Amino acid sequence: MPADVMEKNSSSPVAATPASVSNTPDKPKTASEHRKSSKPIMEKRRRARINESLGQLKTLILDALKKDSSRHSKLEKADILEMTVKHLRNLQRVQMTAALSTDPSVLGKYRAGFSECMNEVTRFLSTCEGVNTDVRTRLLGHLANCVNQIHAMNYPAQPQIPSAAAPHPAYGQPMVQLPAAAPQSSPAPIACKMGGPPVEAAKVYGGFQLVPASDGQFAFLITNPAFPQNGSVIPLYTNSNVGTALPPSVSPSVMPSVTADSVWRPW
């Protein structure tokens, strides 16, 4: 009997062990386990965001380039990104050209800023340890080439047409595109109207001479060296009731009067 009792007592804790284990609550997940379980969900959301942004970018770039979206419905992601990069570079060139036409000092400021950044990178690479010598040499060489290209850039200033010219009510404002060239002062006086006093010629733009009149009108005279100095000139007036412009070697009293129908006009 005592032996049987001892066997029952010794076996009772073992039999009770599974019941105690089943009643214990589940252990909380660690941070690494939580990241592993949520990684597929985060990856799915990330891909959805990328695809949504690429879809919007495709619509915007096709509208900006004025291309038919039906013909480019199956564009690859790499094509969309390349088209976007090219479009942004073109916009940057246009904005830089517009800024230089209004403020010629923009190019100098850009050069100074780029040179300052290059000097800062050079100082950092010269004092930083652990940078490969080959990488440092290639980086500094690339920046030096960029500086040379920037200093070689030359955007000529666009000439400003005086705003005092009043157009004729029957015609629109004449638009004359001049070649980009540095203005040069012309000391020779030119009479712009029949019988009027000679007016000092203000500037010369790339072979075209801007001659302001006393009443606010203006004319462009061809002064290219290929033409003789005593040859005829082509006046462009904003008014039809004017005479021809005369070179300084011709007197107004010698020239016959010219009617409005014989004057060449761009319109």
From Swiss-Prot:
Biological process, per Gene Ontology: negative regulation of DNA-templated transcription; negative regulation of muscle organ development; negative regulation of neuron differentiation; negative regulation of transcription by RNA polymerase II; Notch signaling pathway; regulation of neurogenesis
InterPro entries with a match to the protein in the record: bHLH_dom, HES_HEY, HLH_DNA-bd_sf, Orange_dom
UniProt feature, compositional bias: Basic and acidic residues: 26-35
Any one Gene Ontology molecular-function term assigned to this protein's record: protein heterodimerization activity
Domain comment quoted from the record: Has a particular type of basic domain (presence of a helix-interrupting proline) that binds to the N-box (CACNAG), rather than the canonical E-box (CANNTG).
Coiled-coil region(s): none
Superkingdom to which the source organism belongs: Eukaryota
Stretches with biased composition (Low complexity): 10-22
Gene3D superfamilies in UniProt: 6.10.250.980, Helix-loop-helix DNA-binding domain
Chain span(s) of sequence motif WRPW motif: 264-267
Locations listed in the record: Nucleus
Ranges where the Orange domain occurs: 110-143
Organism of origin: Xenopus laevis (African clawed frog)
GO CC, one annotated term: nucleus
Keywords, ordered alphabetically: Developmental protein, DNA-binding, Notch signaling pathway, Nucleus, Repressor, Transcription, Transcription regulation
Keyword match Ion transport: no
Oligomer and partners: Transcription repression requires formation of a complex with a corepressor protein of the Groucho/TLE family. Interacts with the bHLH protein hes2, and binds DNA in the form of a heterodimer with the bHLH protein hey1/hrt1. Interacts with the bHLH protein hes6; this interaction may inhibit the transcriptional repressor activity.
Name of the protein in its database record: Transcription factor HES-1-B
Main location per the UniProt record: nucleus
Keyword Nucleotide-binding on entry: no
Domain bHLH: 34-91
Region (Disordered), start-end ranges: 1-43
Protein role: Transcriptional repressor of a subset of early mesodermal genes including myod1 and t/bra. Binds DNA on N-box motifs: 5'-CACNAG-3'. Acts as a negative regulator of myogenesis, mediating Notch signaling to repress expression of myod1.
